[in-house]
């Protein structure tokens, strides 16, 4: 039966007795829940001083190393002994083959009352192993023999894996994370979870159901790897009516900042209703035009959220965020999430006052914000499929009917570069003379803006559709059929 000795994060033993006891209990419970999700039974779990001894019926080293609150986990052999000589022989007999023809070092930690020191143990074991090795090298050994002596038991370390540290999940409250699925928001979610906060995901569907399903897949991967001691929720809000409202009533350069403010407003209402302690975003200072310090101050001042807004990545640059994404195993998943078609791709204002922002928000139909905040959809990350998490729209299609009028709604430069055969650019379309008895298929890069336009055209009596997932997904599908 595999046995593991877990070194908890260094801050846990420093807490008060009451808090320390609560954190150990939560950590052991999280370990049990995570292993149970992998059909692994936790046979034994007990606190030994500042460490936790765990026994499982099958190998579980990697699973244990993915639990917040764990600093290091080591597979160990438990040795009982009566004196130093017996202990040294037990250790040597189990490690001879490991040190054979290699330079080695013996590292010993000891606690409790003994008639010997840690150095005595190291010397005795080293003397027994030296004839089988290339000698002792304390500075640059090929292999280390690591032993921890506690009372009348010794723990001989073998496989070791580093954990994430932090605090046990659920020990610090609940957070609602604004989640796009790109590089930033998953790393922000991971960082706040590392501090003991259970996170749920709030995703705004900006038009393309395909992009939103990709975001759900990132949330599931993050949950499987790091959050499996509870059941995270994926909450979606159809933001397309608000985007349409912004495009109709707000000048080009202000749209992105107004959109961010509306995201805060809806998130704050949902967080308050569902009892979250905080809202978390993946914002990094000045990474985007709408994320300058002036704009962030203006947005928060204009919205005045009841919830505290936490930004774990505020001081990170993009390269650091991407490196974290790689380290926590999400890079390949986040890199597949396409950016939604921008409502203001250029000339975004970098400095706005809260008064100006408030005046812009007042142009909008505030009833839409209330409606969107009340029409959220909640699914369990582990049990739902991407299609259940993000249902498709009736306006979306996967292929282009043969008699369709095809309209490219991207920039004119992109249209000239790689438009679909037979497509015309949006700027060339005379909607007064456009036939209403033929399918009109619109496309953009990811399917977001084209969906909004398709809805608008349907309201005017056209048989309008949006290419699901945009041009990239459509062309990828064509490649597969060739």
Swiss-Prot record:
Disulfide bonds: 341-444
UniProt entry keywords in alphabetical sequence: ATP-binding, Cytoplasm, Disulfide bond, Nucleotide-binding, Redox-active center, RNA-binding, Thiamine biosynthesis, Transferase, tRNA-binding
Main location group: cytoplasm
Pathway per the UniProt entry: Cofactor biosynthesis; thiamine diphosphate biosynthesis
GO molecular function ontology, one term from the record: CCA tRNA nucleotidyltransferase activity
Residue span(s) of domain THUMP: 58-160
Record's catalysed reaction(s): [ThiI sulfur-carrier protein]-S-sulfanyl-L-cysteine + a uridine in tRNA + 2 reduced [2Fe-2S]-[ferredoxin] + ATP + H(+) = [ThiI sulfur-carrier protein]-L-cysteine + a 4-thiouridine in tRNA + 2 oxidized [2Fe-2S]-[ferredoxin] + AMP + diphosphate; [ThiS sulfur-carrier protein]-C-terminal Gly-Gly-AMP + S-sulfanyl-L-cysteinyl-[cysteine desulfurase] + AH2 = [ThiS sulfur-carrier protein]-C-terminal-Gly-aminoethanethioate + L-cysteinyl-[cysteine desulfurase] + A + AMP + 2 H(+)
Cross-referenced CDD domains: PPase_ThiI (cd01712), RHOD (cd00158), THUMP_ThiI (cd11716)
Annotated catalytic residues: 444
UniProt keyword Ligase present: no
Name this polypeptide is given: tRNA sulfurtransferase
Ranges in coiled-coil conformation: none
Cellular-component GO terms for this entry: cytosol
Lineage per the UniProt record: Archaea, Thermoproteota, Thermoprotei, Desulfurococcales, Desulfurococcaceae
Ligand binding (ATP): 178-179, 203-204, 260, 282, 291
Record-annotated Rhodanese domain positions: 400-482
GO biological process, alphabetically ordered: thiamine biosynthetic process; thiamine diphosphate biosynthetic process; thiazole biosynthetic process; tRNA 4-thiouridine biosynthesis
Family: Belongs to the ThiI family.
């Amino acid at each position: 039966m595999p046995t593991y000795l877990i070194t908890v994060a260094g801050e846990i033993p420093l807490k008060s007795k009451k808090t320390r006891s609560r954190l150990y209990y939560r950590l052991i419970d999280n370990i049990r829940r995570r292993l149970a999700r992998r059909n692994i039974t936790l046979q034994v779990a007990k606190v030994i001083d500042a460490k936790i001894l765990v026994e499982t019926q099958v190998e579980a080293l990697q699973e244990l190393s993915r639990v917040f609150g764990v600093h290091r986990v080591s597979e160990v052999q438990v040795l009982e002994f009566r004196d130093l000589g017996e202990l040294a022989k037990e250790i040597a007999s189990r490690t001879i083959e490991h040190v054979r023809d290699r330079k080695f070092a013996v590292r010993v930690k000891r606690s409790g009352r003994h008639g010997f020191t840690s150095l005595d143990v190291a010397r005795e074991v080293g003397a027994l192993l030296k004839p089988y090795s290339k000698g002792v090298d304390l500075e640059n050994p090929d292999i280390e023999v690591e032993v921890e002596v506690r009372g009348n038991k010794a723990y001989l370390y073998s496989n070791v894996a580093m954990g994430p540290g932090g605090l046990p999940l659920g020990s610090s409250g609940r957070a609602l994370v604004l989640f796009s699925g790109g590089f930033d928001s998953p790393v922000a979610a991971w960082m706040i979870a590392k501090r003991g906060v259970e996170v749920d995901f709030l995703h705004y569907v900006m038009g393309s159901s395909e992009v939103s399903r990709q975001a759900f897949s990132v949330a599931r991967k993050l949950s499987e790897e790091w959050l499996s001691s509870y059941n995270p929720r994926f909450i979606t809000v159809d933001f397309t009516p608000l985007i349409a409202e912004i495009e109709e009533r707000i000048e080009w350069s202000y749209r992105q900042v107004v959109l961010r403010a509306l995201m805060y407003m809806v998130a704050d209402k949902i967080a308050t209703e569902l009892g979250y302690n905080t809202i978390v975003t993946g914002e990094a200072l000045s990474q985007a035009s709408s994320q300058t310090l002036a704009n962030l101050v203006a947005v928060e001042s204009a919205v005045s959220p009841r919830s505290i807004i936490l930004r774990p990545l505020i001081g990170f640059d993009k390269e650091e965020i991407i490196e974290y994404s790689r380290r926590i195993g999400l890079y390949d998943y986040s890199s597949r999430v396409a950016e939604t078609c921008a409502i203001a791709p250029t000339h975004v204002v970098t400095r706005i006052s809260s008064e100006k922002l408030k005046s812009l928000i007042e142009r909008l139909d505030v009833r839409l914000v209330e409606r969107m905040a009340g029409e959220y959809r909640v699914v369990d990350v582990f049990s739902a499929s991407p299609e259940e998490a993000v249902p498709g729209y009736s306006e979306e299609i996967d292929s282009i009917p043969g008699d369709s009028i095809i309209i490219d709604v991207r920039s004119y430069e992109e249209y000239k570069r790689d438009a679909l055969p037979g497509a015309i650019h949006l700027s060339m379309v005379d909607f007064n003379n456009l036939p209403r008895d033929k399918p009109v298929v619109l496309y953009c890069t990811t399917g977001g803006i084209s969906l909004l336009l398709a809805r608008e055209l349907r309201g005017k009596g056209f048989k309008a559709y949006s290419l699901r997932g945009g041009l990239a997904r459509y062309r990828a599908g064509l490649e597969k059929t060739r």
